[in-house]
Amino acid sequence: YLHKLGVDAIWLTPFYVSPQVDNGYDVANYTAIDPTYGTLDDFDELVTQAKSRGIRIILDMVFNHTSTQHAWFREALNKESPYRQFYIWRDGEPETPPNNWRSKFGGSAWRWHAESEQYYLHLFAPEQADLNWENPTVRAELKKVCEFWADRGVDGLRMDVVNLISKDPRFPEDLDGDGRRFYTDGPRAHEFLHEMTRDVFTPRGLMTVGEMSSTSL
């Protein structure tokens, strides 16, 4: 049917394992398909059938944050774990967040973790912890995710809220707003994306498109 319509590419929104707090944009495993949608074998068959009809497959990559159910975040709850640095943690008091930034879903962008006595950043739901792109190991792991799907025949990636991946490292108070000017189109966003392009997107021939949250034309 899609072939007869002249469709030559299909963009699939997140189908990864997820608690579904945000319609799958809270990813708990980047390389596993939620049983609700099927299996990796089903995906491979989809790719095979699509390519036989000249239809390319584009996947949604949610790389600004993960679900707090992701194995990385579960490990990060231990302050001594190397995964602690996969996320953005800051000191504060139980009732006093590190700054006044607001979540796009309402309320503070910081959630207190009592056991480790620090806050973690979540620009969206509290169940969506922001990844620390300043950590090269995080970037390396995300490249592996892209490679995994490229190996399965994916042709392109749609990068969710990709212009939020670089935050002002000072994490200053925003005296005139909700903080978005300090994390939108941040200081290293272009650098990070150039690195991904050099190391993965170009070598694998992946088409990419980025969602630019809070960016005006």
Describe the role of every protein-language-model region.
Residues 1-147, 151, 164-215:
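Acidic/aromatic-lined carbohydrate-recognition and catalytic surfaces
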Residues 10, 157-159:
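Hydrophobic residues within beta-strands of alpha/beta enzymes
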Residues 154:
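Conserved protein kinase catalytic-loop anchor
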